[in-house]
Amino acid sequence: MDSNTVSSFQVDCFLWHVRKRFADQEMGDAPFLDRIRRDQKSLKGRSITLGIDIEAATRAGKLIIERILDEESDEALKMNIASVPASRYVTDMTPEEMSRDWFMLMPKQKFAGPLCIRMDQAILDKNIVLKANFSVAFDRLETLILLRAFTSEGAIVGEISQLPSLPGHTSEDVKNAIGILIGGLEWNDNTVRVSETLQRFAWGSSNENGRPPFAPKQERKMAGTVESEV
């Protein structure tokens, strides 16, 4: 096993522990708490994949961080902070919409890279909107927290989320997953639109009809046999 993979996991475990202690003192905001919950699932998945105990990794990560801090000068710290692009949190969904449980009558699931796509294929002839909470850097989607598909009545009928065991994804991963979800929902004569906010940050533009500018290859894929995709 690559030593960098192990040490990266150890550092991530300790940093999560620090953030959790901070949150336990009720000092974290909503995006901060969302990241803690998301990263906890990711660390559990990586622990299983790597075969490394999280508690032992956390202790090892603490030693690595302490060594780095002992060697770090204040000036170097200032320069590193200045070089990191500032990201912000964009919310289409309310906390209630993000945390609400939902159920599928005819569940379908697809894994597209590090993202999991779920949808209810029992939904017919509905107007559906895709809304998401995500982080943005340089005015482009950086990390998807959660995407959900809502009918005009407010029911949840689809979802895109990260796989805990495969952390990290690109904006292209997100756009491909959205295309698969739209194709699956439209297969049953539903009308699907993407929120203007999500269009703007994922594609850099927005259409009034809610249809993002998918590439021709993606359009052909969406028009194909959905059952093989979802």
Curated annotation (Swiss-Prot):
What InterPro entries would the database entry show? NS1, NS1A, NS1A_effect_dom-like_sf, uS15_NS1_RNA-bd_sf
- Keywords from the UniProt entry: Eukaryotic host gene expression shutoff by virus, Host cytoplasm, Host gene expression shutoff by virus, Host mRNA suppression by virus, Host nucleus, Host-virus interaction, Inhibition of host innate immune response by virus, Inhibition of host interferon signaling pathway by virus, Inhibition of host PKR by virus, Inhibition of host pre-mRNA processing by virus, Inhibition of host RIG-I by virus, Inhibition of host RLR pathway by virus, Interferon antiviral system evasion, RNA-binding, Ubl conjugation, Viral immunoevasion
Report motif location: Nuclear export signal.
137-146
Region PABPN1-binding: what ranges?
223-230
- Motif Nuclear localization signal in this chain: 34-38
User: What is the protein name given in its UniProt record?
Assistant: Non-structural protein 1
Instruction: Name the segments for region: RNA-binding and homodimerization.
Output: 1-73
Cellular component (GO) terms are: host cell cytoplasm; host cell nucleus
- What's the record's remark on domains? The dsRNA-binding region is required for suppression of RNA silencing.
| Quaternary structure and interacting proteins, as annotated | Homodimer. Interacts with host TRIM25 (via coiled coil); this interaction specifically inhibits TRIM25 multimerization and TRIM25-mediated RIGI CARD ubiquitination. Interacts with human EIF2AK2/PKR, CPSF4, IVNS1ABP and PABPN1.
HAMAP family reported for this sequence = INFV_NS1
Q: Annotated region CPSF4-binding: where?
A: 180-215
Query: What is a biological process (GO) this protein takes part in?
Result: symbiont-mediated suppression of host PKR/eIFalpha signaling
Described purpose of this protein according to its UniProt entry: Inhibits post-transcriptional processing of cellular pre-mRNA, by binding and inhibiting two cellular proteins that are required for the 3'-end processing of cellular pre-mRNAs: the 30 kDa cleavage and polyadenylation specificity factor/CPSF4 and the poly(A)-binding protein 2/PABPN1. In turn, unprocessed 3' end pre-mRNAs accumulate in the host nucleus and are no longer exported to the cytoplasm. Cellular protein synthesis is thereby shut off very early after virus infection.
Q: Which family does it belong to?
A: Belongs to the influenza A viruses NS1 family.
**Segments for region (Disordered):** 204-230
Q: What does UniProt say on post-translational modification here?
A: Upon interferon induction, ISGylated via host HERC5; this results in the impairment of NS1 interaction with RNA targets due to its inability to form homodimers and to interact with host EIF2AK2/PKR.
Coiled-coil zones: none
Keyword Secreted set for record: no
Location within or outside the cell: Host nucleus; Host cytoplasm
Q: Name one GO molecular function term.
A: RNA binding
